[in-house]
Structures are given as structure tokens and as C-alpha cells.
């Protein structure tokens, strides 16, 4: 396979990429980094910003997970049909990143004391995505346009994580609830999500996810 993910044993910031590649029928390798590997320092020095994940497309190496998603989107025609759609996809993905950062801050820095307040704020944060869905084909398809985009994979991955954290979090959002089920039931993606490669990989590196 031409693609390689360089990352710790976690879904983390790579699961949206894995979902995209699986759904698109792409093959990839995993270079799993242990904490001992990371502590040695060589991988950290090689990384542009001193952090993982890293990604290889043949002999081309890239860092920053959203840049990796965009590379895959360009490679697999998942970036809209025109510049306006591409800009809307970027806008949605930036919103996903905003919520992911809030989620990760709670998971890694304030899980015990911050989880309840985080879950209470979810209706506001998830409401943005419900309205975005409603504005495109009455919420019956994808978040932008008539075809799946990299932002769909990123959003569905983050929603999967939230359904583990707070299983009822989508109960007030019928469009998002149907959307997650619809995207997750695409045949190749469903096969991946049912596999041990997905199910046995922890969501977060510190084991805190519910």
C-alpha cells in the first residue's frame, strides 16, 4: 500500500482518515509508535511540529491530521465539486476541529471534574451541525453537496466518540442521529467499523472515553 499512518495505538486523530480510506477502498499500513519509541526522541525530532500523527503517501511525508485528511480528499475526489463547496467543506471541518479540541481538552486535562459540564454544553455544540445538515438537502444526505466529503468522515468519527461519552447525546437531533447511522452503514465503512482493527483500538491514548 502507498499510504502509511504513523501513530500511537489509538483511534485519536487518525480514525477519520482510516474511515475515509476504508470507505474508498484504499489500502494502508500502520506504523504503531509505542511510548518507549516516542521517549527516545528521534521520531519527535523528525516530526515537523514535534507531534504525531505522521502520514506517508508513497515517498511524501506529511504531518497535521487535517492536512492529511485534505490530501486524501484531493486524492479521492472528496473535496466538493467547485470552490464554493470546497470552502463550505473547510468551514464544516473547522467546526469539527473546534469541537474536537474541546473534547480532547476535557479528556486529557479535566476528565474527572469537567465531563459533566462538557456534556451539558453538548446540545449547543451539536446543534450547529444539526442546522448545517438541515440546510443541505433537508439533512437526507451529506453535510455539504450531493457527495460524501472528508468533513463527513471527520464529523461522524467525532460523533462516534461522543456517543461513547454520552450515549443519549444525539437524542434531540434526529438529523444527526440518522446521518451517523446512514454514513456508518456504507458497506465498506460498515465492514471496517465492525472489524477488530477499529473495535480493539482505544479511542484515546489515556483510556478515558466514557
Curated annotation (Swiss-Prot):
Family under the similarity heading: Belongs to the GST superfamily. Pi family.
Residues bound to glutathione: 7, 13, 38, 44, 51-52, 64-65
Residue intervals of the GST N-terminal domain: 1-80
Full protein name: Glutathione S-transferase P 1
Catalysed reaction equations from the record: RX + glutathione = an S-substituted glutathione + a halide anion + H(+)
Domain GST C-terminal: 82-203
Superkingdom of the source species: Eukaryota
Gene Ontology annotations of biological process type: glutathione metabolic process
Keywords: Cytoplasm, Mitochondrion, Nucleus, Transferase
One CC-aspect GO term: cytosol
Amino acid at each position: 500500500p502507498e499510504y502509511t499512518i504513523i501513530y500511537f495505538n489509538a483511534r485519536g486523530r487518525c480514525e477519520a482518515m482510516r474511515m475515509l480510506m476504508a470507505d474508498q477502498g484504499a489500502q494502508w499500513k500502520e506504523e504503531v509508535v509505542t511510548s518507549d519509541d516516542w521517549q527516545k526522541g528521534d521520531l519527535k525530532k523528525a516530526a515537523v511540529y514535534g507531534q504525531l500523527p505522521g502520514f506517508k503517501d508513497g515517498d511524501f511525508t506529511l504531518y497535521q491530521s487535517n492536512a492529511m485528511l485534505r490530501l486524501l480528499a484531493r486524492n479521492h475526489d472528496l473535496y466538493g465539486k467547485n470552490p464554493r463547496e470546497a470552502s463550505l467543506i473547510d468551514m464544516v471541518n473547522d467546526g469539527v476541529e473546534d469541537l474536537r479540541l474541546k473534547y480532547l481538552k476535557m479528556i486529557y486535562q479535566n476528565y474527572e471534574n469537567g465531563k459533566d459540564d462538557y456534556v451539558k454544553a453538548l446540545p449547543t455544540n451539536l446543534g450547529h451541525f444539526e442546522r448545517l445538515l438541515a440546510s443541505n438537502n433537508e439533512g437526507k444526505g451529506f453535510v455539504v453537496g450531493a457527495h460524501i466529503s472528508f468533513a463527513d468522515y471527520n464529523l461522524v468519527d467525532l460523533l462516534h466518540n461522543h456517543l461513547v461519552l454520552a450515549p443519549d447525546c444525539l437524542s434531540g437531533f434526529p438529523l444527526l442521529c440518522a446521518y451517523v447511522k446512514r454514513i456508518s452503514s456504507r458497506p465498506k465503512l460498515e465492514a471496517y467499523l465492525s472489524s477488530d482493527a477499529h473495535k480493539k483500538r482505544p479511542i484515546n491514548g489515556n483510556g478515558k472515553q466514557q
